[in-house]
A protein has these predicted regions:
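Anion-binding and metal-coordination hotspots
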Residues: 1-173
């Protein structure tokens, strides 16, 4: 088909050591990916590094009626330089934390103070990794733009009764 990919926007399940090796600061093609919350990734370590900044006005912005905390940090991931954009969707964090407290009040009371702090942001906390040097607000907008594109393709696919992109040939294009 002659399609060349020069930019990727991916969910956490697709971010891997191999991908970071191919797309890091200094590489030509760009990537935005959601960092998985699993072993080998500094997901929670980044929270501990920025936790005292969460709630500070300097790092706050609004996107689609949600208040966000966002900060960019240059890190090494799998020995490659990359930007980690650390976010808290404060609306989701507060709403889901409140729901958690209603259902788990006794469990919460038993937690250590530092763990209680984590639970106040846990349900809105996420990290994006990218080789793009921009503001946290702009990168988040680019990341969520992916969902808008997915909706367009899904709607067009259903409306036109198209095959998935992976099954397209020169003649179907």
């Amino acid at each position: 088909l002659g399609i060349e990919i020069d930019s990727l926007v991916l969910d956490a399940g697709y971010v891997s050591k191999e991908l970071i090796g191919a797309f890091h600061i200094g590489t030509e093609k760009t990537i935005i990916g959601r960092m998985p919350a699993r072993k080998g990734y500094p997901f929670k370590t980044l929270y501990w590094e920025v936790k005292d900044l969460i709630g500070k006005g300097k790092y706050a912005f609004v996107r689609k009626h949600h208040a966000y905390f966002g900060i960019k940090k240059k890190i090494n991931l799998f020995e490659k330089p990359i930007y980690a954009y650390v976010y808290v969707d404060q609306y989701n964090a507060l709403k889901r934390f409140s729901d958690y407290l209603v259902d788990h009040e006794d469990e919460y009371a038993e937690l250590k103070v530092k763990d209680k702090d984590w639970y106040t942001v846990k349900y809105g906390y996420f990290v994006l990794v990218s080789n793009i040097d921009t503001s946290p607000k702009d990168l988040l907008s680019d990341y969520f733009g992916r969902t808008d594109i997915e909706v367009v393709f899904k709607t067009a696919k259903e409306y036109l009764d198209l095959l998935p992109l992976s099954k397209w040939t020169d003649s179907t294009v």
